[in-house]
């Protein structure tokens, strides 16, 4: 199936093409029509399968840009994922010429700046649950106008650490809102919680025989700590001719900033 047949919106199809995304993945083929119809959805698919676009495209197309109300809330567990989703939403809006206002809200950012930004009446918010709940309690986010809630990385957000916060956010909204949740895994614990909050959800599970995106090659290098940066630079130079985009994952924010500075210096 083509994006034209799925989305029925040429501007969005062209926006995807500008990112060299021309054919839908399996999760996108199944999820996009369901979300466009307003169904609640649980989507389980392997990392790299295109889950973010599976919900972003229909969510943006369902947004009433003429309204000044918040319509969509996307919850993600980490600051990095929030920013990634937010930037993808912004890019789609720009390239599809959608007059939709998006805002990212993360815990480490200045809350007063976020409150000021909320006065611009975003249609879509992407955020981490803790700060989102803070702003709801401060009555800076009106949950009564939200029509769609997306939970990204549901097993992470519905674990014992985040479960109460996420449930409190969802309960602050109208019951007839649309709720969708996505992850590479779906524990019984997460599914039990979602069953209490969803209305006859469609469950979409994409099996992957290799348990990974077939277009991703896995290998690892063992290196002394002092040699890591040198090895990373060699690897990046080796991949430079064949890789258009390269993602580097780290588990430490300050170290990440330091690495970016070093890579820029040693171009």
Residue spans of the language-model regions?
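Conserved helicase RecA-like core
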Residues: 2-267
């Amino acid at each position: 199936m083509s994006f034209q047949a799925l989305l029925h919106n040429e501007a969005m199809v062209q926006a995807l093409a500008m990112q060299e995304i021309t054919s839908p993945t399996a999760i996108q083929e199944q999820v996009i029509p369901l979300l466009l119809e307003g169904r609640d959805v649980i989507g389980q698919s392997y990392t790299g399968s295109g889950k973010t676009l599976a919900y972003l495209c229909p969510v943006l197309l369902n947004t009433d840009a003429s309204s000044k109300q918040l319509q969509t809330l996307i919850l993600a567990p980490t600051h990095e994922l929030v920013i990634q989703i937010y930037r993808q939403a912004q890019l789609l809006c720009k390239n599809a010429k959608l007059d939709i206002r998006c805002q990212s809200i993360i815990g480490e950012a200045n809350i007063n700046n976020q409150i000021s930004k909320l006065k611009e009446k975003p249609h879509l918010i992407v955020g981490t649950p803790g700060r989102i709940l803070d702003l709801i309690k401060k009555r800076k986010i009106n949950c009564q106008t939200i029509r769609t809630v997306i939970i990204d990385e549901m097993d992470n957000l519905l674990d014992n650490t985040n479960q109460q916060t996420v449930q409190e956010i969802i309960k602050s909204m109208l019951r007839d809102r649309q709720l969708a949740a996505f992850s590479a895994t779906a524990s019984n614990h997460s599914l039990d919680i979602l069953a209490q909050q969803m209305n006859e959800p469609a469950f979409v599970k994409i099996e992957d025989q290799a348990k990974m995106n077939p277009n991703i090659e896995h290998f690892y290098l063992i290196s002394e700590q002092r040699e890591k940066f040198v090895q990373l630079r060699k690897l990046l130079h080796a991949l430079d001719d064949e890789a258009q985009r390269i993602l580097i994952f780290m588990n430490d924010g300050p170290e990440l900033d330091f690495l970016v500075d070093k890579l820029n210096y040693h171009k």
